[in-house]
Amino acid sequence: DLYSYRYDLTDYSAYRTNTIGGGVRLGFPLTLNARASARYTLRRDEVEIPASFCDPNAAVVSISLCQQRGAYTTSLVGYGVRLDRRNDPINPTRGFYTALNQDLAGVGGDVNYLKTEVEGGIYYGFSPSFILSATGSAGYVDGWNGDTVRINERFYKGGNSFRGFETAGIGARDLNSARGDALGGKAYAIGSVELTVPTFLPEQYGVKAALFSDFGTLGMLDDEDKLTVAGAVDPNIVDDLSLRASAGVSIFWRSPMGPIRFDFSQVLAKEDYDKTETFRFSTSTRF
């Protein structure tokens, strides 16, 4: 694979990333329901933050964020293992799945880290109209050989991954800026419980509904990323692993353009600096 893209997070933080790179992947079955994969990636990332944001005379973001600017090369190897015993990968009504992925950066290049993510879910259908599911995911990334975790290698959660919160709406935040720039986190754990319920609409309308509750946490920066230029702890960088939670209703519509999802959410637990939302519209793979 060869690719080039720009990841623009300036609506939620102070930076954007330009990336060019490539990689090779190999996947193979272990059993009827289990697969494994291996990969190698080589890429060049350039983190851009406007110079005016980092002017010492009028800085609007923290020094630790400004220090993330620059270009660097990442060379990593990784693998994944997945067991899937659901009766349908798109709209399951029974069964379970679990997956593990790890990436080791530092096989050459400029950065060194180990990133691990796990996920899983279980599904049980009481009837065609009532289907209960419980899913969860967790991740941790940490530098090695003296490296900290750069801002674009951290985890960001919210939006589709945590309903009730904006994209990058939870996690560590830099309050030096009026907006409160998202800084992500080295660790996260998120769970979701969902119950599909009948809508009592004719099937040809293509509408389904579900009640849900999402809950979890995200945070944990390196200590070096919480300091001022003088080396003191910056009180305007907030970072904790407190519980966040939300509940609401999702509507799935099989539209002529493809599956669409509408989420109506109410936040039940949050920090004052989190960014929340009550409605989200998105495309969906599920129906």
Regions found by a protein language model. Give the residues of each.
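Gram-negative/organellar outer-membrane beta-barrel architecture
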Residues: D1-D88, P92-Y97, R163-G164, I170-L175, ...
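Transmembrane beta-barrel strand/turn architecture of Gram-negative outer membrane proteins
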Residues: N18-L30, T98-G106, N112-W144
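Hydrophobic core residues within well-ordered beta-strands of beta-rich domains
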Residues: I20, S75-V77, F96, T116, ...
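Residues on the lipid-exposed face of transmembrane beta-strands in outer-membrane beta-barrel proteins
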Residues: G22-F28, V77-L83, V118-I122, G136-A138, ...
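Short loop/turn motifs that connect adjacent beta-strands in outer-membrane beta-barrel proteins
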Residues: T31-A36, N87-F96, G109-V111, F126-L132, ...
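Extracytoplasmic gating/loop element in the C-terminal half of outer-membrane beta-barrel translocons
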Residues: S129-D225
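Outer-membrane beta-barrel transmembrane domain signature
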Residues: I131, G216-A247
